[in-house]
Amino acid sequence: MTGEYKNTLDEKGRIMFPAKIRAELPDSNLVITRGVGNCLWIFTADKWKKFSDEIMKKTSLFKAQSLLVMRRLIAPAQEIEVDKNGRISIPQSLRECAGLEKDCIILGLGKCFELWDLKQYEKYLKESEPDFSEAAEALGEIGF
């Protein structure tokens, strides 16, 4: 599930989940959590289970880096549903974490979706251009 979908957050903190994505979902159950950077990650329930199980297997309560990941990704995760009108409700605490205002963009990354405030995403794109060039070059070096 890939693509970029611009949409608007309504006054109740809901956003329309794109019809193309909804058609590919196994059901209406999703999990939303903080992402890396100023975004939120949205997983299907089954992908979240695999992702979170893998994190839990490879982390320790006695390691600071593990605790950081668990506190930032696992703890804030919340189950949400696509409603009958195709919308998802973004919890207030997560809207604040990602700085979501009105105009947003949903990115399909294959493994999950990212939800960004549109202005923050555009800023990220500009700032990350040099890093993208380096990453693309590194992929070329390993045979892509």
Curated annotation (Swiss-Prot):
One of the record's GO cellular component terms: nucleoid
Keyword Repeat: yes
Keyword annotations of the record: Cytoplasm, DNA-binding, Repeat, Transcription, Transcription regulation
InterPro entries in alphabetical order: MraZ, MraZ_C, MraZ_dom, MraZ_N, MraZ_sf, SpoVT-AbrB_dom, SpoVT-AbrB_sf
Residue runs in coiled coils: none
Compartment(s) where it occurs, according to its Swiss-Prot or TrEMBL record: Cytoplasm, Nucleoid
Residue intervals of the SpoVT-AbrB domain: 4-47, 77-120
GO BP terms in the entry: negative regulation of DNA-templated transcription initiation
Example of a GO MF term: DNA-binding transcription factor activity
Family: Belongs to the MraZ family.
PANTHER family: TRANSCRIPTIONAL REGULATOR MRAZ
Assembly mode: Forms oligomers.
Name recorded for this polypeptide: Transcriptional regulator MraZ
Organism: Treponema denticola (strain ATCC 35405 / DSM 14222 / CIP 103919 / JCM 8153 / KCTC 15104)
